[in-house]
Amino acid sequence: MSAGKVSIRDFLKKKGKEKITMLTAYDYPTAKIMSMTNLDGILVGDSLSMVVLGYENTLKVSMKEMLVHLDSVVRAKPRQLVVADMPFLSYEVSANTAVKNAGLFVRHGADSVKLEGGEEMADVVRKIVRAGIPVMGHIGLTPQRFLRIGGFRVLGKSKHEEEQLLRDAEVLEEAGIFSLVIENTYADVAKKITEKLKVPTICIGAGPYCDGQILVIHDVLGLSEFTPYFAKAYVNLKEEIQKAVNKYVEEVRESKFPQGENYKERES
């Protein structure tokens, strides 16, 4: 395991060299376990809206809820770079609101923030960066904007979409992002963006050519109700949890638990 706290500079140094690895985390125990691994970054993602809180999309999660989960992750003191997702309407209304909310995340222990959007978000990104807060960009399939782009689909098929994605990436880099998430685009498009930018790119569902990868922890652990085609379950914890719960129920009902080592009695 690598030693020391991962920094923005560490991310930048990995560009074109060693792949960056990121996962989401939303609570203390998960972040604590991750802190003992070689993982580079933790995203406290707005995906918690769906995988933790049970909402149907990412639009429902609030700043208050995001801050509660960020606090939980930060208390674990992970060595990884901690990135906080800015939820829907926490940065789109005005640049001043965006800076204020980004500042709240940093005050609560985030090392940086992530926000969705392309060139239309450049001024917002620029002002957050000028306030001294590192920003991770996010283009491609941006879940907070799924209504506008016509649902969840792979982007970059047409020449127009490809050119827009490239323009988004370049404008965001000029605005000061330190890295860029590319989600659910065609792999060759993500490759072109990666080759074009000086900052590292991190893919989710956009192929192997980026400078790094990020996945939702529930997908990796086999806990999701539905696993996206671009994800991979490295263990089936859902099945293991079911087995453990059923074993507990069985032992309690058959008076096999608790045993002597599980309780104390007064000596007569």
UniProtKB/Swiss-Prot annotation:
Please write the reaction equations for the catalytic activity of this protein.
3-methyl-2-oxobutanoate + (6R)-5,10-methylene-5,6,7,8-tetrahydrofolate + H2O = 2-dehydropantoate + (6S)-5,6,7,8-tetrahydrofolate
What GO biological process terms are annotated to this protein in UniProt? coenzyme A biosynthetic process; pantothenate biosynthetic process
* Residues that hold Mg(2+) according to the record: 46, 85, 116
Could you say which cofactors this protein requires? Answer: Mg(2+)
Q: Give the residues the record marks as binding 3-methyl-2-oxobutanoate.
A: 46-47, 85, 114
Q: What is its EC number?
A: 2.1.2.11
Query: Where does this one sit in the cell?
Result: Cytoplasm
> What pathway does the UniProt record associate with this protein?
Cofactor biosynthesis; coenzyme A biosynthesis
Give me the comment on cofactor binding.
Binds 1 Mg(2+) ion per subunit.
A Pfam family that the UniProt record links to this protein: Pantoate_transf
The UniProt record lists the keyword Transferase: yes
An MF annotation (GO) of this entry: 3-methyl-2-oxobutanoate hydroxymethyltransferase activity
Q: What GO CC terms are in its UniProt record?
A: cytoplasm
Q: Which residues form the active site?
A: 183 (proton acceptor)
Keywords per UniProt:
Coenzyme A biosynthesis, Cytoplasm, Magnesium, Metal-binding, Transferase
State the disulfide connectivity.
Answer: none
Q: What class of enzyme is it?
A: transferase
Q: PANTHER family annotated for this entry?
A: 3-METHYL-2-OXOBUTANOATE HYDROXYMETHYLTRANSFERASE (PTHR20881:SF0)
Family (UniProt)? Belongs to the PanB family.
Q: How does it assemble?
A: Homodecamer; pentamer of dimers.
Name by which UniProt lists this protein: 3-methyl-2-oxobutanoate hydroxymethyltransferase
* Encoding gene (name): panB
